[in-house]
Each structure stands twice: as structure tokens, then as C-alpha cells.
Amino acid sequence: VLYHYEYTTSLTFATDDPAKAAWQASVPELAHSHDFLVNCVLSVASLHLGRLHEDKIQKTNMNAVAASRMNKALTTYRPQLGNINASNAAALFASSTLTAVYLFRTSAIDIETLRETIPYGTIIPPAGVVDKMMSCILRTVWGLRGPLTVLMSGWNHVINGAMHPVAARKWWPSRRIPATLRAEEEDQRLRNIDSLWMDTNKAWDPQTRHLNDALAHLREAYALVSQLTLTGVFPSMTAVPYAVDDTTVGILTDRGAIFVWSTLISREFIHLLETKDRDALVILAYYAVLPGRVRNVWWLEGLGADFVTAIAMAIGIENWHLIEWPAQVVGVDLWNAFGVRQDRLMGKPDELHMDVI
């Protein structure tokens, strides 16, 4: 499993060579001194092997190993978050990021398991199933708070340590503006979302500030992604195929850009998501487009479609028109969400610029 991590799994976490080197060489080195990181590495590598196995029993076994290792990691990892220092910051940052990857992948697995319990052709599943689907989605949102916690408390230690290439993004543009005509059109779509609350009697509600902030951060995330898919502007890297406009596949220079939003939204906004606030869930559905457009990354497979499907079930048929565009982009037919899925999780033949490892 460790061999698989070093030569295969580690290369799927980053798009640039310095960061790949950190995952491939520095993380195993850090793991020598931190058992929790060893278990995180074994967990995610097992999960990756489970993804690659065709045999269902082997797949189930590897996923069980992954869960066991992650549970062991968390028992020793969590207590150390209260004392982040020079000796453990890099290992904690690596562990928290691997935990996020674990949560992304297991959320997709758990939702697939739930889908198998839903009769073919169901339009809206029972409320209990919808709650479980939303719980899976929110797990991924919370997942990225782990790396954020480490960075906020131990930034100087991380930025000066072995994980510096993973944490630092000095070359990102400081001014986030839509970089193409298509990006400007999508920004207009995002801008229009605030009419759901600003043009109603909810405009003065306390929660409005959190909705506005989350939407503003999402507009910046879309703009950043549009800037990082421009050709020949930013550092040349082993980048990831990204469906820029749902038909043309560009190259996203750094997929880390799609995760920024989850680290910026407030806890109050996350609480709105947990209480199934319609307007917050619409914003989340538009966010789902970003991971939904990434191609050929095993731990992001299906995530965009899962987000939109769960959100659609939570907000009800009467509100489906509000998420029609995100559903179309990620390939989800809302009226046939539990039939044969039509989304292009693995990309079309001409999109396979990078093998699915």
C-alpha cells in the first residue's frame, strides 16, 4: 500500500511538480516521526486501490481498510491540533489535507450506496435518504476546514517547511476578475442569485450578510478559475483537464483554486446549509459546477453531480428552476436523477489529456 502511495496516489494530489514532489517524497519522510500521518497515507492509498479494483469484494475490503486507518489517524491527529508547533505543523497540514481527500471520495461512495437503495425512476426519495445525502455533501464542506485550521494556527511553520509547495500560491493573480467572455456571462449568472433574498422581505434578515459574503467569495472563485485556465499566462505545469465551458476542455493550472471557497465561507453560512436554507443551497449548487467540471481526478469523481442531486432533493421540485443551470453543467437530469446517470465523470475520449491513474 505504501508503494502504491509513493508511486501512484501521491501524484494525484497536485498539478505542479514541486507540490507533487512534496506529496511523493516529503510526506513519507514526515510520516517517520508521526504515526497519524502514516495512517492517513495508508488510508487514502487504500481508498485509491479500492477505486481501481473491479472486483466488488476487493473494493469493499480496501474501503474498509481505508476507514480503519483513518479512524486510527484521527484519534492521534485531533489532540495535536490544540498544540500546533514547528515540529508537527507540516505533518498536521499533510494529514488534514489527506483527510479532506478521504472525505471527498467516501462521500461519493456513500452517496452511490444510497442511490442503490432508491428504486429506479424515483423522483424524490424519502426525507431520511435526502438527509443522509445532504450529510455526505456537508462532510466535504467541513473537510476543508481542517487544513484551514492548521494554516491559520501554524502558517509560518508550514510555509517554511516541507509542505511549502502545497500551501503557497504566490503566483496566483491578486485581482480576481473574469478572464473570458464566457466567465463574464457566468459571473452575471452568479450576480443574479442575490435577487432570491435582496428583492424580498428577507433583505434585512441577519442571515443575508452570510449569503452575500458566500456569493461574493464564489464569484471570486469562478473568476480565479477562469484566470487559471488561460493558456500561456501562468507557470507551465502538469495541469488537469477542466471543462471550461462544458464543451471545450481547457487546462486548469491549479485545481486548488476550486477549494478556496469552502475555506472562506462562514460557519454561519454552513449552518444555513445544515438547516437546508434554500438560498444557501442554491449558492452551493453553483459552487458544485467547479469540482463538477474537473476531469479525471479519482477523488473528485461524481462530486459535482452528487452535490446538485442532493441539493435538488432538499429544496424540492418547486425550486428546481433555480438550479437548472448547475444541473445542466454537471450533467444531471433532475427528473431522472435516480435513473442511469448521464454525467461525464470520466470525460470524453478527446478529453483524456491525463490518464486516470
Question: What function would you assign to each model-found segment?
Answer:
Residues 29, 132-357:
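C-terminal effector modules of eukaryotic transcription factors
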Residues 1-82, 311, 348-357:
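Amphipathic alpha-helical dimerization/protein-protein interaction segment
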Residues 61-78, 104-158:
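Structured all-alpha helical bundle cores of eukaryotic regulatory proteins
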